[in-house]
Amino acid sequence: MAAKEVLFGNDARVKMLAGVNVLANAVKVTLGPKGRNVVLDKSFGAPLITKDGVSVAKEIELEDKFENMGAQMVKEVASKANDAAGDGTTTATVLAQAIVTEGLKAVAAGMNPMDLKRGIDKAVVAAVAELKTLSQECSDTKAIAQVGTISANSDESIGEIIATAMEKVGKEGVITVEEGQALENELDVVEGMQFDRGYLSPYFINKPETGSVELENPYILLVDKKISNIRELLPILEGLAKTGKPLMIIAEDVEGEALATLVVNNMRGIVKVAAVKAPGFGDRRKAMLQDIAILTGGTVIAEEIGLELEKATLEDLGTAKRVVITKDDTTIIDGTGEQEQISARVAQIKIQAEESTSDYDREKLQERMAKLAGGVAVIKVGAATEVEMKEKKARVEDALHATRAAVEEGVVAGGGVALIRVASKIGELDVANEDQKHGVTIALRAMEAPLRQIATNAGEEASVVANNVKNGSGNYGYNAGSDVYGDMLEMGILDPTKVTRSALQFASSIAGLMITTEAMVGDVPQEAGAGDMGGMGGGMGGMGGMGMM
């Protein structure tokens, strides 16, 4: 086991604070509308230019192992805030730095670290409760666009495209961000349920100009097995021939004689038909077939629940207004399933997604939920260069997370104003001693830090701006973008409550742990032994001998 180096008390805290400051100082320059960029060196390709706090934090690794421990703990704050709300990473880092700096000063002055932590925790609990009372619902498109704009560093086009996407696919809908081919941002909306399975035979195509199959008001047969014997399908086909309506088959596979007969029937015009493979694999395929059944008002024909294909009737089939099948995917538009059942299925999938421990499973469940709830929107980010593309895509993703958080828990006045108002409303808290009281003061003072940093980044005197805002009331604050004071909500400067809450909670949690740290243990760096180097030399000599042959 390698030898360890141990630091105690003030020596440990000084090193830890130095690491915290290096990371926080690099991150906090990005805060606010006039925040600066940070350039990150990459081992290959062009350097990355970003204003995303968590991206900067993740890059920082310090040479001194004890300073690095401090930096890594603050990095955890940024990562946690990013995971919980998808934004607010810089705010969380600024708050953590403020609490740690003041907390360690108090510890050095002889105060009890545990009591300081208890005081900080009490202040944060009171602040979170106060934030909830200040929070306002964010439901209209204009407010959603404003939240997206602020999070995307005042880029109105990003805020508007996200608001449009949410309007089209609903608040629960899936919105994905991709790299586009154009210079401008584009929005593609896929209405209805789409899955990545195309037609099983090109002979089903009835729209040669687009190379697709389009069926109007079709019946939809859902089968959880392979179909190879046409006799199993005859009762359904005979019933359909009388109605004159088209048929779409979704099965594990359709092959051999069954597929050949369907193609012949289709080409002769006896029955208009198309077949596709069911989406997914294993249990996910069964679940997705059930989703389609609920969406279209049909039944999945599966032998494991006692249903046989030969005995299926038209009543077992689902229906939809329209189906479009291309070489690669299938879209079912306006399924005729009961809205009550669809809503119940969405709620069931939502619970599964919340309980899932796998990110991949959660993503797939959210995708299924969106397909049932109304559709999928794809934002294609446009830019002139690859460097700009990466930076812009990160901003769009941040803005998307922020708008989702705003819809979930509402919004508060932005620009650091909400935390100032919260701090002013917290009166005398019930504390056990003076040290806990000082802990409360540390937390309340730290809540000014985001506003002060926004003002500093805008080139203003932080103390003057903070006093002006504190002397105001309600949503009165400082708009650093246009350098004016006024009502933040009217000026469209909003922060999602969830983002502000998460930043405060995670910052105080990690900062509390750092304040109560009394010792740090790290590996003693090992010097390379001379014997090892000699061994390498011998090997090289052997290679030289080989070269002489």
Curated annotation (Swiss-Prot):
SUPFAM superfamilies found in the cross-reference section: GroEL apical domain-like, GroEL equatorial domain-like, GroEL-intermediate domain like
Pfam families: Cpn60_TCP1 (PF00118)
Location (main, coarse): cytoplasm
Isomerase keyword on record: yes
One Gene Ontology term, aspect cellular component: cytoplasm
Subcellular location(s) per record: Cytoplasm
Protein residues bound to ATP: 30-33, 51, 87-91, 415, 495
Catalytic activity, reaction form: ATP + H2O + a folded polypeptide = ADP + phosphate + an unfolded polypeptide
CDD domains in UniProt: GroEL
A Gene Ontology molecular function term of the record: unfolded protein binding
Listed InterPro entries: Chaperonin_Cpn60_CS (IPR018370), Cpn60/GroEL (IPR001844), Cpn60/GroEL/TCP-1 (IPR002423), GroEL-like_apical_dom_sf (IPR027409), GROEL-like_equatorial_sf (IPR027413), TCP-1-like_intermed_sf (IPR027410)
This protein's name: Chaperonin GroEL
